[in-house]
Amino acid sequence: MKISHCRLLKKIQLRLLEFFVLEVTARSAADILGIQPNSAALFYRKIREVTAYHLEQESHEIFDGVVELDESYFGGVRKGKPGRGAAGKVAVFGILKRGGKVYTKVVGDTKSETLMPLITRKIAPDSIVYTDCYRSYNALDVSHFYHERINHSTLFAQGKNHINGIENFWNQAKRVLRKYNGILKESFPLFLKECEFRFNYGTPKQQLKILKNWTQI
């Protein structure tokens, strides 16, 4: 998949790609380049679509060794009692290979029967899996993994016993998404994959090189 059927000049496309990597909003990029905001927004969407496509192509990669699992919630207005989840929020499940990449998936809920198929499909048997004490991870105790739990009420990190990596990703993703001041729910998976890409592919220079290749600009 690449960016095609775009009426913008190639030099404008390249500048938009550079601005995207630098986290310049589409509106600001449009102002700088003297183009219509809708044109910049549409091009940014095309970048996200290409990015999501290529990340999906890579999603068959199996994580092994030490892996961290966690779930988080994005958007919406928190209602009711505080705790796991909230009305109007989007649930996201994350799997991080410690020292490596993160994989994310929007999920309808965070029940064990929803998460376990994702876990067994993505993580190699005999891997060491770190989670918090959420009950949905209880099934890992009788799985083909070595399961270690983190009790946040008593400690945050102790040596290798932590899930700081995946929690760092959540913080980074929410920082990136906060500047958009609201994202349509149907578009959220594309923005999530943008965050996954930024986390997995190093410096802006590296990201630009990869996106030039993926988009064929």
Where are these regions (language model features)?
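Residue-level recognition of single "structural anchor" positions
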Residues: 1-217
